[in-house]
């Protein structure tokens, strides 16, 4: 726990999207109570905050062609990285094949519709195997109705 705080102490730049900034410290009190873990909160003055709109220019400076988009669903601060080569990295977002189980979750559906509006081939998840999404991407929508 708290690896981001430890990385910042080592001098590594932490980049945070503006849609995530309000959630940076929401779990600090919980983790600080756990005596068997060393937890280091992230100092606010070490946050490098960029907007989703700025993400393409930011990534381009790193040699990456793509952008970062806001995709709530797993949590209110979820983001996804969309690469121009047709790859999306969606982290903890619920896998596309499971979305039907959440038929009343318009936030999740809207996030998937936003992701699928790009010309995607493959999605990489944080906790699931990669998925070929070209079938979904052809329709440019994921309608749960």
List PLM regions with ranges.
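Active-site HxH/HxHxD metal-binding segment of metal-dependent hydrolases
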Residues: 1-56
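Metallo-beta-lactamase
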Residues: 30-31, 65-144
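Short amphipathic alpha-helix with an adjacent loop that forms part of the alpha/beta core around
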Residues: 57-62
């Amino acid at each position: 726990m708290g690896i981001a705080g430890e990385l910042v102490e080592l001098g590594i730049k932490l980049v945070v999207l503006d849609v995530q900034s309000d959630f940076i410290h929401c779990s600090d009190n919980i983790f600080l109570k756990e005596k068997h873990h060393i937890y280091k909160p992230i100092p606010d003055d070490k946050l490098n905050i960029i907007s989703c709109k700025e993400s393409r220019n930011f990534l381009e400076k790193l040699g990456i062609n793509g952008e970062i988009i806001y995709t709530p669903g797993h949590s209110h601060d979820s983001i996804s990285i969309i690469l121009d080569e047709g790859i999306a990295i969606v982290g903890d977002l619920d896998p596309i094949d499971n979305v039907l189980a959440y038929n009343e979750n318009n936030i999740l559906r809207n996030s998937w519709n936003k992701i699928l509006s790009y010309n995607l081939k493959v999605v990489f998840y944080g906790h699931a195997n990669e998925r070929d999404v070209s079938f979904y991407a052809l329709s440019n929508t994921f309608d749960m109705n």
